Protein backbone atom coordinates (compact mmCIF):
# COMPACT_ATOMS: atom_id res chain seq x y z
CA UNK A 1 0.00 0.00 0.00
CA UNK A 2 2.85 2.39 0.81
CA UNK A 3 4.30 1.76 -2.66
CA UNK A 4 0.95 2.52 -4.30
CA UNK A 5 0.73 5.79 -2.34
CA UNK A 6 4.26 6.71 -3.39
CA UNK A 7 3.61 5.93 -7.06
CA UNK A 8 0.20 7.61 -7.38
CA UNK A 9 1.38 10.73 -5.48
CA UNK A 10 -2.20 11.42 -4.47
CA UNK A 11 -3.40 12.66 -1.11
CA UNK A 12 -4.43 9.49 0.71
CA UNK A 13 -6.99 8.62 3.37
CA UNK A 14 -6.52 5.32 5.22
CA UNK A 15 -9.57 4.24 7.26
CA UNK A 16 -9.18 1.70 10.07
CA UNK A 17 -11.90 0.24 12.29
CA UNK A 18 -10.41 1.20 15.67
CA UNK A 19 -8.04 3.70 17.28
CA UNK A 20 -5.39 1.16 18.21
CA UNK A 21 -4.95 -0.16 14.68
CA UNK A 22 -5.12 3.39 13.31
CA UNK A 23 -2.27 4.39 15.65
CA UNK A 24 -0.18 1.43 14.42
CA UNK A 25 -0.80 2.37 10.77
CA UNK A 26 0.01 6.02 11.50
CA UNK A 27 3.31 5.03 13.10
CA UNK A 28 4.25 2.76 10.18
CA UNK A 29 3.35 5.32 7.51
CA UNK A 30 5.38 7.98 9.36
CA UNK A 31 8.38 5.67 8.98
CA UNK A 32 7.65 5.00 5.29
CA UNK A 33 7.14 8.71 4.50
CA UNK A 34 9.46 10.66 6.84
CA UNK A 35 9.51 13.74 4.57
CA UNK A 36 5.77 13.87 3.83
CA UNK A 37 2.78 15.07 5.79
CA UNK A 38 1.28 12.11 7.68
CA UNK A 39 -1.71 12.96 9.87
CA UNK A 40 -3.91 11.15 12.39
CA UNK A 41 -7.66 11.74 12.64
CA UNK A 42 -9.72 9.82 15.20
CA UNK A 43 -12.38 10.69 17.77
CA UNK A 44 -10.85 13.09 20.29
CA UNK A 45 -12.95 11.84 23.18
CA UNK A 46 -11.33 9.88 25.98
CA UNK A 47 -14.88 9.63 27.32
CA UNK A 48 -18.11 10.33 25.43
CA UNK A 49 -21.68 10.29 26.69
CA UNK A 50 -23.92 11.64 23.89
CA UNK A 51 -26.91 13.86 24.57
CA UNK A 52 -30.04 11.72 24.71
CA UNK A 53 -33.57 11.50 26.07
CA UNK A 54 -35.34 8.37 27.36
CA UNK A 55 -39.10 9.07 27.13
CA UNK A 56 -40.03 5.85 28.98
CA UNK A 57 -38.52 7.22 32.20
CA UNK A 58 -38.57 10.94 31.29
CA UNK A 59 -34.77 11.01 31.65
CA UNK A 60 -32.69 13.63 29.88
CA UNK A 61 -28.98 12.80 29.69
CA UNK A 62 -26.72 15.75 29.01
CA UNK A 63 -23.77 15.43 26.71
CA UNK A 64 -20.71 14.62 28.80
CA UNK A 65 -17.27 14.39 27.29
CA UNK A 66 -13.62 14.29 28.15
CA UNK A 67 -11.55 15.60 25.27
CA UNK A 68 -8.01 14.44 24.63
CA UNK A 69 -6.18 17.67 23.79
CA UNK A 70 -3.35 15.84 22.05
CA UNK A 71 -5.76 14.17 19.62
CA UNK A 72 -7.72 17.39 19.09
CA UNK A 73 -4.44 19.00 18.07
CA UNK A 74 -3.71 16.14 15.67
CA UNK A 75 -7.18 16.45 14.09
CA UNK A 76 -6.57 20.14 13.45
CA UNK A 77 -3.11 19.30 12.14
CA UNK A 78 -4.63 16.77 9.71
CA UNK A 79 -7.02 19.30 8.16
CA UNK A 80 -4.29 21.98 8.06
CA UNK A 81 -2.06 19.51 6.20
CA UNK A 82 -4.79 18.82 3.64
CA UNK A 83 -5.30 22.52 2.93
CA UNK A 84 -1.56 23.26 2.80
CA UNK A 85 -1.28 22.05 -0.80
CA UNK A 86 1.48 19.56 0.10
CA UNK A 87 1.20 15.76 -0.44
CA UNK A 88 -0.60 14.37 2.60
CA UNK A 89 -1.53 10.99 4.07
CA UNK A 90 -4.20 10.84 6.78
CA UNK A 91 -4.93 7.76 8.90
CA UNK A 92 -8.45 7.87 10.34
CA UNK A 93 -11.18 5.82 11.97
CA UNK A 94 -14.87 6.02 11.03
CA UNK A 95 -14.84 9.43 12.76
CA UNK A 96 -13.93 10.75 9.32
CA UNK A 97 -17.57 10.47 8.16
CA UNK A 98 -18.95 12.64 10.99
CA UNK A 99 -19.82 16.31 10.60
CA UNK A 100 -16.76 18.54 10.76
CA UNK A 101 -17.65 21.93 9.31
CA UNK A 102 -17.11 23.36 5.86
CA UNK A 103 -13.53 23.18 4.52
CA UNK A 104 -14.27 26.34 2.53
CA UNK A 105 -15.32 28.29 5.62
CA UNK A 106 -12.42 26.89 7.65
CA UNK A 107 -9.90 27.98 5.04
CA UNK A 108 -11.69 31.32 4.66
CA UNK A 109 -11.11 31.97 8.38
CA UNK A 110 -7.37 31.22 8.05
CA UNK A 111 -5.06 34.19 8.58
CA UNK A 112 -2.41 34.79 5.93
CA UNK A 113 0.45 37.09 6.89
CA UNK A 114 3.28 38.16 4.57
CA UNK A 115 6.45 40.11 5.24
CA UNK A 116 5.97 43.75 4.20
CA UNK A 117 2.18 43.52 4.52
CA UNK A 118 0.32 46.54 5.91
CA UNK A 119 -1.88 45.49 8.81
CA UNK A 120 -2.86 47.15 12.08
CA UNK A 121 -1.94 45.28 15.24
CA UNK A 122 -5.53 45.52 16.52
CA UNK A 123 -6.84 44.08 13.24
CA UNK A 124 -4.51 41.09 13.50
CA UNK A 125 -5.57 40.47 17.11
CA UNK A 126 -9.23 40.67 16.07
CA UNK A 127 -8.67 38.07 13.33
CA UNK A 128 -6.94 35.71 15.77
CA UNK A 129 -9.83 35.95 18.21
CA UNK A 130 -12.32 35.32 15.37
CA UNK A 131 -10.32 32.20 14.51
CA UNK A 132 -10.89 31.04 18.13
CA UNK A 133 -7.34 31.74 19.37
CA UNK A 134 -7.16 32.81 23.01
CA UNK A 135 -4.97 35.60 24.28
CA UNK A 136 -2.73 34.52 27.13
CA UNK A 137 0.20 36.80 27.91
CA UNK A 138 1.39 34.55 30.76
CA UNK A 139 1.41 30.93 29.61
CA UNK A 140 1.60 29.90 25.97
CA UNK A 141 0.11 26.68 24.63
CA UNK A 142 -1.25 25.53 21.25
CA UNK A 143 -4.22 27.74 20.39
CA UNK A 144 -2.89 30.74 22.37
CA UNK A 145 -1.30 34.04 21.39
CA UNK A 146 0.31 36.89 23.31
CA UNK A 147 1.08 40.51 22.54
CA UNK A 148 4.21 42.34 23.68
CA UNK A 149 4.54 45.79 22.20
CA UNK A 150 4.81 45.43 18.43
CA UNK A 151 5.39 41.68 18.64
CA UNK A 152 2.64 39.05 18.41
CA UNK A 153 3.52 35.45 19.31
CA UNK A 154 1.18 32.66 18.20
CA UNK A 155 1.28 28.90 18.73
CA UNK A 156 -1.04 27.41 16.10
CA UNK A 157 -3.54 24.95 17.57
CA UNK A 158 -2.02 22.20 15.42
CA UNK A 159 1.69 22.90 16.02
CA UNK A 160 4.40 22.94 18.67
CA UNK A 161 6.30 25.78 17.00
CA UNK A 162 5.73 29.43 17.84
CA UNK A 163 5.18 32.03 15.14
CA UNK A 164 6.52 35.50 15.96
CA UNK A 165 5.16 38.38 13.90
CA UNK A 166 7.25 41.52 14.39
CA UNK A 167 5.56 44.78 13.39
CA UNK A 168 7.08 48.15 12.62
CA UNK A 169 4.17 50.51 12.90
CA UNK A 170 1.47 49.02 10.67
CA UNK A 171 3.91 46.98 8.59
CA UNK A 172 4.93 43.33 9.09
CA UNK A 173 8.70 43.62 9.47
CA UNK A 174 9.60 39.96 10.07
CA UNK A 175 8.00 36.52 10.51
CA UNK A 176 10.05 34.07 12.59
CA UNK A 177 9.53 30.43 13.58
CA UNK A 178 10.64 29.78 17.18
CA UNK A 179 10.96 26.80 19.47
CA UNK A 180 8.05 27.49 21.85
CA UNK A 181 10.03 26.40 24.93
CA UNK A 182 13.56 27.75 24.41
CA UNK A 183 12.35 30.59 22.11
CA UNK A 184 15.40 29.96 19.93
CA UNK A 185 14.84 30.89 16.30
CA UNK A 186 14.37 27.90 13.99
CA UNK A 187 13.94 29.90 10.81
CA UNK A 188 12.31 32.80 9.00
CA UNK A 189 9.60 32.94 6.36
CA UNK A 190 8.05 35.57 4.12
CA UNK A 191 4.58 34.04 4.30
CA UNK A 192 2.65 32.18 6.96
CA UNK A 193 -0.89 30.79 6.95
CA UNK A 194 -2.49 30.29 10.36
CA UNK A 195 -5.52 28.01 10.33
CA UNK A 196 -8.30 28.36 12.94
CA UNK A 197 -8.00 26.82 16.41
CA UNK A 198 -11.35 25.00 16.12
CA UNK A 199 -13.21 23.21 13.36
CA UNK A 200 -16.62 24.66 14.21
CA UNK A 201 -16.60 28.40 13.52
CA UNK A 202 -18.02 30.78 10.96
CA UNK A 203 -17.49 34.29 9.64
CA UNK A 204 -19.70 37.04 11.11
CA UNK A 205 -21.72 37.54 7.90
CA UNK A 206 -22.52 33.82 7.72
CA UNK A 207 -23.35 33.84 11.43
CA UNK A 208 -25.98 36.55 10.97
CA UNK A 209 -27.67 34.60 8.17
CA UNK A 210 -27.57 31.43 10.26
CA UNK A 211 -29.17 33.15 13.27
CA UNK A 212 -32.06 34.35 11.08
CA UNK A 213 -32.48 30.85 9.67
CA UNK A 214 -32.46 29.25 13.14
CA UNK A 215 -35.05 31.76 14.39
CA UNK A 216 -37.30 30.94 11.44
CA UNK A 217 -37.01 27.20 12.04
CA UNK A 218 -37.75 27.73 15.75
CA UNK A 219 -40.88 29.75 14.95
CA UNK A 220 -42.16 27.06 12.58
CA UNK A 221 -41.35 24.24 14.99
CA UNK A 222 -43.08 25.83 18.00
CA UNK A 223 -46.43 25.59 16.20
CA UNK A 224 -46.05 21.80 16.06
CA UNK A 225 -45.34 21.11 19.75
CA UNK A 226 -47.44 20.96 22.90
CA UNK A 227 -46.86 23.42 25.76
CA UNK A 228 -44.15 21.52 27.65
CA UNK A 229 -42.01 20.75 24.60
CA UNK A 230 -42.64 24.24 23.20
CA UNK A 231 -41.38 25.93 26.38
CA UNK A 232 -38.38 23.60 26.59
CA UNK A 233 -37.29 24.17 22.98
CA UNK A 234 -37.86 27.93 22.99
CA UNK A 235 -35.85 28.52 26.17
CA UNK A 236 -32.97 26.31 25.06
CA UNK A 237 -32.71 27.62 21.50
CA UNK A 238 -32.95 31.29 22.49
CA UNK A 239 -30.13 30.79 24.99
CA UNK A 240 -27.98 29.20 22.27
CA UNK A 241 -28.78 32.07 19.89
CA UNK A 242 -27.69 34.64 22.46
CA UNK A 243 -24.38 32.82 22.88
CA UNK A 244 -23.86 32.62 19.11
CA UNK A 245 -24.62 36.33 18.63
CA UNK A 246 -22.37 37.40 21.51
CA UNK A 247 -19.47 34.94 21.31
CA UNK A 248 -19.78 33.37 17.87
CA UNK A 249 -20.38 29.88 19.27
CA UNK A 250 -22.32 27.93 21.89
CA UNK A 251 -22.24 24.52 23.51
CA UNK A 252 -23.53 22.04 20.94
CA UNK A 253 -23.17 24.50 18.04
CA UNK A 254 -22.65 21.52 15.73
CA UNK A 255 -26.39 20.79 16.03
CA UNK A 256 -27.03 23.99 14.06
CA UNK A 257 -24.41 23.20 11.41
CA UNK A 258 -26.97 22.98 8.60
CA UNK A 259 -27.79 26.67 9.04
CA UNK A 260 -24.14 27.72 9.10
CA UNK A 261 -23.26 25.61 6.06
CA UNK A 262 -26.26 26.83 4.09
CA UNK A 263 -27.45 23.27 3.51
CA UNK A 264 -30.98 22.11 2.78
CA UNK A 265 -32.86 19.77 5.12
CA UNK A 266 -31.58 16.21 4.66
CA UNK A 267 -28.47 17.30 2.79
CA UNK A 268 -25.26 15.63 3.98
CA UNK A 269 -22.88 17.50 6.24
CA UNK A 270 -19.27 18.31 5.44
CA UNK A 271 -16.76 15.85 6.86
CA UNK A 272 -13.04 15.08 6.65
CA UNK A 273 -13.45 13.53 3.20
CA UNK A 274 -14.47 16.94 1.80
CA UNK A 275 -11.03 18.31 2.76
CA UNK A 276 -9.44 15.94 0.22
CA UNK A 277 -11.06 17.38 -2.90
CA UNK A 278 -12.09 15.20 -5.85
CA UNK A 279 -8.87 13.34 -6.63
CA UNK A 280 -7.51 11.27 -3.75
CA UNK A 281 -6.71 7.67 -2.86
CA UNK A 282 -8.91 5.88 -0.33
CA UNK A 283 -7.58 2.83 1.53
CA UNK A 284 -10.03 0.87 3.71
CA UNK A 285 -8.09 -1.40 6.06
CA UNK A 286 -9.68 -4.62 7.36
CA UNK A 287 -12.57 -3.77 5.04
CA UNK A 288 -14.64 -6.78 6.15
CA UNK A 289 -14.92 -5.04 9.57
CA UNK A 290 -14.63 -1.35 8.63
CA UNK A 291 -17.34 -1.32 5.94
CA UNK A 292 -20.07 -2.70 8.26
CA UNK A 293 -19.09 0.03 10.76
CA UNK A 294 -19.49 2.68 8.06
CA UNK A 295 -22.87 1.13 7.18
CA UNK A 296 -24.19 1.35 10.74
CA UNK A 297 -23.19 4.84 11.90
CA UNK A 298 -26.13 6.79 10.46
CA UNK A 299 -28.96 4.63 11.85
CA UNK A 300 -27.70 4.78 15.44
CA UNK A 301 -27.25 8.55 15.32
CA UNK A 302 -30.70 9.11 13.79
CA UNK A 303 -32.49 7.00 16.41
CA UNK A 304 -30.88 8.92 19.29
CA UNK A 305 -31.64 12.33 17.75
CA UNK A 306 -35.29 11.45 17.08
CA UNK A 307 -36.19 11.39 20.78
CA UNK A 308 -34.40 14.70 21.39
CA UNK A 309 -36.29 16.36 18.53
CA UNK A 310 -39.70 14.80 19.23
CA UNK A 311 -39.64 15.97 22.85
CA UNK A 312 -38.41 19.51 22.29
CA UNK A 313 -34.74 19.28 23.23
CA UNK A 314 -33.47 20.01 19.73
CA UNK A 315 -34.67 21.55 16.47
CA UNK A 316 -35.26 19.14 13.55
CA UNK A 317 -32.12 20.55 11.89
CA UNK A 318 -30.11 18.58 14.49
CA UNK A 319 -30.84 15.52 12.33
CA UNK A 320 -28.49 17.02 9.75
CA UNK A 321 -25.50 17.08 12.10
CA UNK A 322 -24.84 13.46 11.34
CA UNK A 323 -22.44 10.92 9.91
CA UNK A 324 -22.68 10.09 6.23
CA UNK A 325 -25.18 7.52 5.05
CA UNK A 326 -23.37 4.64 3.41
CA UNK A 327 -24.65 5.57 -0.05
CA UNK A 328 -23.26 9.08 0.52
CA UNK A 329 -19.92 7.61 1.58
CA UNK A 330 -19.87 5.56 -1.62
CA UNK A 331 -19.80 8.78 -3.66
CA UNK A 332 -16.24 9.33 -2.37
CA UNK A 333 -15.10 5.88 -3.52
CA UNK A 334 -13.33 6.77 -6.75
CA UNK A 335 -9.78 5.47 -6.29
CA UNK A 336 -10.05 2.86 -3.56
CA UNK A 337 -8.11 -0.09 -2.17
CA UNK A 338 -9.92 -2.56 0.09
CA UNK A 339 -7.43 -4.40 2.32
CA UNK A 340 -8.70 -7.63 3.87
CA UNK A 341 -7.67 -11.23 4.41
CA UNK A 342 -11.34 -12.19 4.01
CA UNK A 343 -13.11 -9.67 1.73
CA UNK A 344 -16.90 -9.80 1.58
CA UNK A 345 -19.08 -9.90 -1.54
CA UNK A 346 -19.28 -6.08 -1.51
CA UNK A 347 -15.53 -5.61 -1.98
CA UNK A 348 -15.39 -8.32 -4.64
CA UNK A 349 -18.24 -6.78 -6.64
CA UNK A 350 -16.81 -3.26 -6.40
CA UNK A 351 -13.25 -4.23 -7.35
CA UNK A 352 -12.16 -4.38 -10.99
CA UNK A 353 -8.92 -6.07 -9.90
CA UNK A 354 -8.19 -8.34 -6.95
CA UNK A 355 -4.52 -8.53 -5.94
CA UNK A 356 -3.67 -11.32 -3.52
CA UNK A 357 -0.86 -10.86 -1.03
CA UNK A 358 -0.54 -14.35 0.36
CA UNK A 359 3.18 -14.83 0.93
CA UNK A 360 4.74 -13.93 4.27
CA UNK A 361 8.39 -12.79 4.45
CA UNK A 362 8.73 -14.99 7.58
CA UNK A 363 7.90 -18.05 5.49
CA UNK A 364 5.18 -19.10 7.95
CA UNK A 365 2.40 -21.19 6.41
CA UNK A 366 -1.31 -21.07 7.07
CA UNK A 367 -1.98 -23.79 9.67
CA UNK A 368 -2.63 -27.42 8.82
CA UNK A 369 -6.40 -27.91 9.11
CA UNK A 370 -8.01 -31.20 10.14
CA UNK A 371 -11.69 -32.15 10.48
CA UNK A 372 -12.46 -34.70 13.20
CA UNK A 373 -15.77 -36.28 14.32
CA UNK A 374 -17.51 -35.02 17.44
CA UNK A 375 -17.58 -38.51 18.99
CA UNK A 376 -15.10 -38.57 21.88
CA UNK A 377 -14.11 -35.00 20.99
CA UNK A 378 -13.33 -34.06 24.59
CA UNK A 379 -10.86 -36.92 25.02
CA UNK A 380 -9.30 -36.07 21.66
CA UNK A 381 -9.09 -32.37 22.54
CA UNK A 382 -7.44 -33.06 25.91
CA UNK A 383 -4.92 -35.33 24.17
CA UNK A 384 -4.04 -32.59 21.65
CA UNK A 385 -3.78 -29.97 24.40
CA UNK A 386 -1.41 -32.24 26.32
CA UNK A 387 0.91 -32.55 23.29
CA UNK A 388 1.13 -28.75 22.95
CA UNK A 389 1.61 -28.19 26.67
CA UNK A 390 4.58 -30.59 26.74
CA UNK A 391 6.20 -28.51 23.98
CA UNK A 392 5.60 -25.25 25.86
CA UNK A 393 2.92 -24.17 23.37
CA UNK A 394 -0.58 -22.80 23.94
CA UNK A 395 -4.08 -23.69 22.72
CA UNK A 396 -7.16 -21.65 21.82
CA UNK A 397 -10.58 -23.33 21.84
CA UNK A 398 -13.60 -21.58 20.35
CA UNK A 399 -17.23 -22.39 21.23
CA UNK A 400 -20.55 -20.93 20.08
CA UNK A 401 -21.91 -19.47 23.33
CA UNK A 402 -20.73 -17.92 26.58
CA UNK A 403 -22.31 -20.76 28.60
CA UNK A 404 -20.48 -23.36 26.51
CA UNK A 405 -17.18 -21.52 27.03
CA UNK A 406 -17.67 -21.48 30.80
CA UNK A 407 -18.80 -25.13 30.97
CA UNK A 408 -15.90 -26.30 28.79
CA UNK A 409 -13.38 -24.36 30.87
CA UNK A 410 -14.82 -25.94 34.03
CA UNK A 411 -14.68 -29.45 32.49
CA UNK A 412 -11.07 -29.04 31.33
CA UNK A 413 -10.05 -27.67 34.74
CA UNK A 414 -11.43 -30.86 36.36
CA UNK A 415 -9.17 -32.82 34.02
CA UNK A 416 -6.14 -30.92 35.39
CA UNK A 417 -5.84 -28.65 32.35
CA UNK A 418 -4.68 -25.13 33.20
CA UNK A 419 -7.49 -23.20 31.49
CA UNK A 420 -9.34 -19.87 31.49
CA UNK A 421 -12.30 -18.60 29.46
CA UNK A 422 -12.82 -15.35 27.59
CA UNK A 423 -16.06 -13.70 26.39
CA UNK A 424 -17.54 -10.26 25.70
CA UNK A 425 -18.66 -9.58 29.30
CA UNK A 426 -15.05 -9.64 30.48
CA UNK A 427 -13.73 -6.07 30.53
CA UNK A 428 -10.87 -4.78 28.38
CA UNK A 429 -8.30 -4.80 31.18
CA UNK A 430 -9.14 -8.36 32.16
CA UNK A 431 -9.07 -9.55 28.52
CA UNK A 432 -5.60 -8.14 27.91
CA UNK A 433 -4.32 -9.55 31.19
CA UNK A 434 -5.71 -13.01 30.36
CA UNK A 435 -3.95 -12.98 26.99
CA UNK A 436 -0.75 -11.77 28.64
CA UNK A 437 -0.92 -14.57 31.23
CA UNK A 438 -1.53 -17.11 28.45
CA UNK A 439 1.61 -15.95 26.65
CA UNK A 440 3.62 -16.09 29.87
CA UNK A 441 2.50 -19.68 30.45
CA UNK A 442 0.48 -19.00 33.61
CA UNK A 443 -2.11 -21.28 31.96
CA UNK A 444 -2.13 -23.30 28.73
CA UNK A 445 -5.62 -23.08 27.23
CA UNK A 446 -7.91 -20.13 26.55
CA UNK A 447 -11.55 -20.88 25.71
CA UNK A 448 -13.52 -18.17 23.90
CA UNK A 449 -16.23 -17.30 21.39
CA UNK A 450 -15.99 -14.66 18.64
CA UNK A 451 -13.14 -12.87 20.41
CA UNK A 452 -10.73 -15.35 18.85
CA UNK A 453 -10.84 -13.68 15.43
CA UNK A 454 -9.13 -10.45 14.29
CA UNK A 455 -6.33 -8.93 16.29
CA UNK A 456 -5.45 -11.81 18.65
CA UNK A 457 -1.75 -12.08 17.86
CA UNK A 458 -0.26 -14.85 20.04
CA UNK A 459 2.85 -16.53 18.57
CA UNK A 460 2.88 -19.12 21.37
CA UNK A 461 -0.44 -20.59 20.12
CA UNK A 462 0.14 -23.67 17.96
CA UNK A 463 -3.38 -25.15 18.13
CA UNK A 464 -6.82 -23.69 17.49
CA UNK A 465 -9.71 -26.07 18.16
CA UNK A 466 -13.16 -25.17 16.79
CA UNK A 467 -16.13 -26.94 18.40
CA UNK A 468 -19.46 -27.26 16.54
CA UNK A 469 -17.66 -26.29 13.34
CA UNK A 470 -20.56 -27.62 11.24
CA UNK A 471 -23.15 -25.26 12.77
CA UNK A 472 -23.58 -22.84 9.87
CA UNK A 473 -23.93 -19.19 10.90
CA UNK A 474 -21.99 -15.98 11.49
CA UNK A 475 -19.41 -17.61 13.79
CA UNK A 476 -18.92 -20.61 11.50
CA UNK A 477 -19.09 -19.10 8.02
CA UNK A 478 -16.21 -19.23 5.55
CA UNK A 479 -14.81 -15.82 6.59
CA UNK A 480 -14.96 -16.52 10.34
CA UNK A 481 -13.37 -19.94 9.98
CA UNK A 482 -10.42 -18.60 7.98
CA UNK A 483 -9.92 -15.75 10.47
CA UNK A 484 -10.01 -18.26 13.34
CA UNK A 485 -7.50 -20.57 11.62
CA UNK A 486 -5.24 -17.54 11.37
CA UNK A 487 -4.82 -17.39 15.16
CA UNK A 488 -2.44 -20.38 14.78
CA UNK A 489 -0.53 -18.99 11.80
CA UNK A 490 2.09 -17.16 13.92
CA UNK A 491 3.59 -20.47 15.03
CA UNK A 492 5.63 -22.83 12.84
CA UNK A 493 3.67 -25.80 14.28
CA UNK A 494 0.30 -24.12 13.67
CA UNK A 495 -2.67 -26.50 13.45
CA UNK A 496 -6.44 -26.00 13.41
CA UNK A 497 -8.81 -28.83 14.33
CA UNK A 498 -12.50 -28.63 13.42
CA UNK A 499 -14.81 -30.94 15.34
CA UNK A 500 -17.70 -31.64 12.96
CA UNK A 501 -19.80 -34.54 11.69
CA UNK A 502 -20.71 -32.80 8.43
CA UNK A 503 -18.54 -30.96 5.92
CA UNK A 504 -20.57 -27.79 5.36
CA UNK A 505 -20.12 -25.46 2.40
CA UNK A 506 -18.30 -23.03 4.69
CA UNK A 507 -15.90 -25.72 5.95
CA UNK A 508 -15.25 -26.97 2.41
CA UNK A 509 -14.59 -23.44 1.14
CA UNK A 510 -12.34 -22.56 4.12
CA UNK A 511 -10.32 -25.79 3.71
CA UNK A 512 -9.81 -25.21 -0.01
CA UNK A 513 -8.77 -21.58 0.50
CA UNK A 514 -6.35 -22.46 3.31
CA UNK A 515 -4.76 -25.25 1.25
CA UNK A 516 -4.38 -22.91 -1.72
CA UNK A 517 -2.63 -20.32 0.49
CA UNK A 518 -0.35 -22.98 2.00
CA UNK A 519 0.73 -24.19 -1.44
CA UNK A 520 1.55 -20.64 -2.56
CA UNK A 521 3.71 -20.07 0.53
CA UNK A 522 5.45 -23.45 0.19
CA UNK A 523 6.31 -22.62 -3.43
CA UNK A 524 7.61 -19.18 -2.39
CA UNK A 525 9.71 -20.68 0.42
CA UNK A 526 11.30 -23.20 -1.97
CA UNK A 527 12.10 -20.53 -4.55
CA UNK A 528 13.68 -18.19 -1.99
CA UNK A 529 15.14 -20.93 0.26
CA UNK A 530 13.22 -19.70 3.32
CA UNK A 531 12.87 -21.84 6.45
CA UNK A 532 9.73 -20.82 8.41
CA UNK A 533 10.29 -19.64 11.97
CA UNK A 534 7.83 -18.82 14.74
CA UNK A 535 7.37 -15.08 15.24
CA UNK A 536 9.20 -13.68 18.28
CA UNK A 537 7.14 -10.99 19.93
CA UNK A 538 7.77 -9.26 23.27
CA UNK A 539 5.21 -9.69 26.05
CA UNK A 540 3.85 -6.34 27.34
CA UNK A 541 4.17 -5.34 30.96
CA UNK A 542 1.19 -5.74 33.25
CA UNK A 543 -0.96 -2.60 33.52
CA UNK A 544 -2.86 -3.63 36.64
CA UNK A 545 -4.78 -6.55 38.14
CA UNK A 546 -8.46 -6.63 38.96
CA UNK A 547 -8.80 -9.23 41.67
CA UNK A 548 -7.51 -7.07 44.53
CA UNK A 549 -9.94 -4.13 44.31
CA UNK A 550 -12.53 -5.45 46.76
CA UNK A 551 -9.88 -6.06 49.41
CA UNK A 552 -8.51 -2.51 49.44
CA UNK A 553 -9.34 0.23 51.92
CA UNK A 554 -11.10 3.45 50.79
CA UNK A 555 -7.82 5.34 51.31
CA UNK A 556 -5.88 2.92 49.09
CA UNK A 557 -8.63 2.93 46.45
CA UNK A 558 -8.61 6.72 46.31
CA UNK A 559 -4.83 6.77 45.96
CA UNK A 560 -4.94 4.14 43.21
CA UNK A 561 -7.73 5.94 41.32
CA UNK A 562 -5.51 9.03 41.05
CA UNK A 563 -2.58 6.91 39.82
CA UNK A 564 -4.67 4.95 37.29
CA UNK A 565 -6.28 8.12 35.91
CA UNK A 566 -2.83 9.68 35.41
CA UNK A 567 -1.66 6.47 33.74
CA UNK A 568 -4.73 6.48 31.47
CA UNK A 569 -4.05 10.04 30.32
CA UNK A 570 -0.40 9.24 29.65
CA UNK A 571 -1.30 6.24 27.49
CA UNK A 572 -3.86 8.35 25.60
CA UNK A 573 -1.25 11.05 24.91
CA UNK A 574 1.13 8.33 23.68
CA UNK A 575 -1.67 7.03 21.39
CA UNK A 576 -1.60 3.66 23.18
CA UNK A 577 -5.39 3.44 23.26
CA UNK A 578 -5.55 -0.23 24.15
CA UNK A 579 -3.80 0.38 27.47
CA UNK A 580 -5.73 3.63 27.97
CA UNK A 581 -8.99 1.67 27.68
CA UNK A 582 -7.69 -0.90 30.15
CA UNK A 583 -6.92 1.86 32.66
CA UNK A 584 -10.34 3.43 32.07
CA UNK A 585 -12.08 0.11 32.81
CA UNK A 586 -10.09 -0.33 36.01
CA UNK A 587 -10.79 3.26 37.08
CA UNK A 588 -14.54 2.67 36.71
CA UNK A 589 -14.35 -0.50 38.82
CA UNK A 590 -12.39 1.35 41.51
CA UNK A 591 -14.97 4.17 41.54
CA UNK A 592 -17.87 1.69 41.86
CA UNK A 593 -16.12 -0.05 44.76
CA UNK A 594 -15.39 3.30 46.45
CA UNK A 595 -19.10 4.22 46.24
CA UNK A 596 -20.06 0.89 47.81
CA UNK A 597 -17.61 1.35 50.67
CA UNK A 598 -18.80 4.93 51.27
CA UNK A 599 -22.41 3.75 51.55
CA UNK A 600 -21.56 1.27 54.32
Located regions from the model:
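Long, amphipathic alpha-helical segments that form or neighbor coiled-coils/leucine zippers used
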Residues: 547-550, 565
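Charged, solvent-exposed alpha-helical segments that act as regulatory interaction surfaces
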Residues: 246, 548, 593-596
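C-terminal tails and terminal domains of large nucleic-acid-associated
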Residues: 561-597
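ASCE RecA-like P-loop NTPase motor cores
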Residues: 1-540, 544, 553, 557, ...
Amino acid sequence: VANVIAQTRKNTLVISHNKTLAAQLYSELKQFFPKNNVGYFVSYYDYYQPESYLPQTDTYIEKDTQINEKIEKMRLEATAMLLSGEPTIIVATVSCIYSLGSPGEWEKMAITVTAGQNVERSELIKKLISARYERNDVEMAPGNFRVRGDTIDIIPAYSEDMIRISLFGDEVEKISILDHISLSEKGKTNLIKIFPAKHYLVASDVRQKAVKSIKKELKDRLTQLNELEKQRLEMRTKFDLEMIEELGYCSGIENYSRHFDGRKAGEKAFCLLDFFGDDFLLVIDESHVTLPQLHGMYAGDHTRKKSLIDYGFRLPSAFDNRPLKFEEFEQYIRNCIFVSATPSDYERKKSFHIAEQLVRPTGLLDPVVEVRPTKNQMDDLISEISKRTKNGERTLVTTLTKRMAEDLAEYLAKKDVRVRYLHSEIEGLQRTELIRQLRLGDFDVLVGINLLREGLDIPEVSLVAILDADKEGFLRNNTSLIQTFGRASRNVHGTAILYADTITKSIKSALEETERRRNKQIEYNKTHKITPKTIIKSIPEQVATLDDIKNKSPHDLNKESIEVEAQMKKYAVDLDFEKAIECRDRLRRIQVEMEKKNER
